[in-house]
Regions:
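Dynamic helix-loop-helix/coil hinge segments at AAA+ ATPase domain boundaries and subdomain interfaces
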Residues: 4-26
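Phosphate-binding P-loop
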Residues: 20, 32-40
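Walker A/P-loop nucleotide-binding motif
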Residues: 40-56
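Conserved P-loop NTPase "ATPase switch" module shared by AAA+ and STAND
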Residues: 63-79, 83-86, 90-101
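Short regulatory helix/loop adjacent to the ATP-binding pocket of P-loop NTPases
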Residues: 102-117
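Conserved AAA+ ATPase "SRH/arginine-finger" region at the nucleotide-binding site
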Residues: 119-131
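C-terminal helical "lid" of AAA+/P-loop NTPase domains
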Residues: 153-157, 164-178
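Conserved C-terminal helix/linker of AAA+ ATPases
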Residues: 177-195
């Protein structure tokens, strides 16, 4: 989303079950579950693209009744500043989703910089093995493809740990299966990973 959105703008059926929790993102999820412990009524959420950060943010806002600013670096800084102040006055949480938290992100507006310096920042990490496994299962499952545990285990131990790599693998293995009329299994996964050039040799099992 490229604007400050109201909860009514989002699908009403998104739930906690839509966001996969693993060790790589559990700390961020816990933080969002305990708004009462926040030092101010705002938090910044960062993480890689395709990490589910916008989904997690929407679920949080739908549950909490708060406000979301997504892609914050692209938004009007005055609007973010006023949203931050409004959150403190109303005591309704504000979640700011951004690529980088300060000091890497340095707004030009001094008043906003001062507010963000007092705002906690949480981060979704790159996917761990458990999350990669479940992402492959879910993404291919959404296309009507049931995957076996050994297929996913083969991919997990070889693919680069990034959400972009996982999404690209799913797209390519699905396309390859259709083009070659091949079953989605380890032989096809091996071919696709080699073609992608994303095999992480350091993660291969001995």
């Amino acid at each position: 989303m490229n604007q400050i959105a109201l909860p009514l703008d989002w699908p009403a059926d998104e739930t906690d079950a839509d966001f996969i929790v693993s060790a790589s993102n559990a700390a961020a999820v816990r933080h969002l579950e305990h708004v009462a412990t926040w030092p101010v009524w705002a938090t910044m959420l960062t993480g890689p693209r395709k990490s589910g950060r916008s989904l997690l943010a929407r679920i949080f806002v739908l549950k909490s009744g708060g406000t979301l600013i997504d892609n914050a670096e692209e938004q009007n800084e005055e609007r973010i500043f006023h949203a931050w102040n409004a959150a403190q006055e109303s005591r309704h949480p504000l979640l700011i989703v951004c690529d980088r938290a300060p000091p890497e992100w340095r707004p030009r507006l001094a008043d906003l910089r001062s507010r963000l310096s007092a705002t906690p920042a949480i981060r979704l990490g790159e996917p761990d093995d458990q999350l990669i496994d479940r992402l492959i299962e879910r993404l291919l499952g959404a296309r009507g493809i049931v995957t076996r545990p050994e297929f996913r285990a083969y991919v997990v131990t070889r693919i680069e740990r990034s959400f972009i790599a996982v999404q690209r693998f799913v797209d390519l293995v699905d396309q390859a299966a259709l083009a070659r009329r091949a079953k989605i299994g380890i032989p096809l996964a091996k071919q696709v990973l080699a073609e992608m050039g994303v095999i992480d040799e350091s993660r291969l099992l001995v």
